[in-house]
């Protein structure tokens, strides 16, 4: 399967980041997927240690085909980081699975998302696919 890249946005929550990485890596398609992580820079000195620890956890992650970590040298804020990251990956790959650091996914999440992206890739009325319904 030609899997969609996974795009994860993180900031200063190392415990959350560890949980999302562990959940993602338990997915069968993780080993076939490239993970792109965009880590925003600390907004203040008070956030610096948590940002550094979050980045350390990402560098130690395993279970993916490749892990690409973008460490922002300056804080872009949530919107700036997401807009730039999504735009970059969409322009490179044409599709993406987007996550933030507080989303712990189910074991078949990557299969579901990749199957749905493939099923609807030529459907002009489908703009996005999401995995959460309230």
Regions found by a protein language model. Give the residues of each.
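Short hydrophobic beta-strand elements that form part
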Residues: 7-8
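Short, well-formed alpha-helical segments that are part of the catalytic scaffolds
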Residues: 13-28
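Acidic donor-binding segment of Leloir-type glycosyltransferases
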Residues: 24-70
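Short glycine/serine/threonine-enriched helix-capping/active-site loop
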Residues: 38, 72, 128-132
């Amino acid at each position: 399967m030609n899997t969609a890249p996974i795009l994860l946005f993180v900031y200063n929550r190392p415990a959350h980041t560890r949980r999302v990485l562990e959940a993602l890596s338990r997915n069968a398609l993780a080993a076939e997927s490239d993970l792109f992580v965009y880590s925003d820079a600390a907004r203040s000195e008070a956030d610096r240690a948590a940002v550094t620890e979050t980045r350390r956890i990402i560098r130690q992650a395993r279970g993916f085909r490749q892990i690409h970590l973008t460490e922002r040298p300056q804080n872009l804020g949530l919107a700036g980081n997401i807009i730039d990251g999504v735009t970059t990956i969409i322009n490179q790959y044409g599709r993406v699975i987007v996550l933030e650091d507080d989303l712990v996914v189910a074991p078949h999440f990557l299969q579901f998302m990749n199957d749905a992206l493939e099923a609807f890739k030529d459907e002009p009325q489908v703009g996005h696919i999401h995995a959460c319904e309230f």
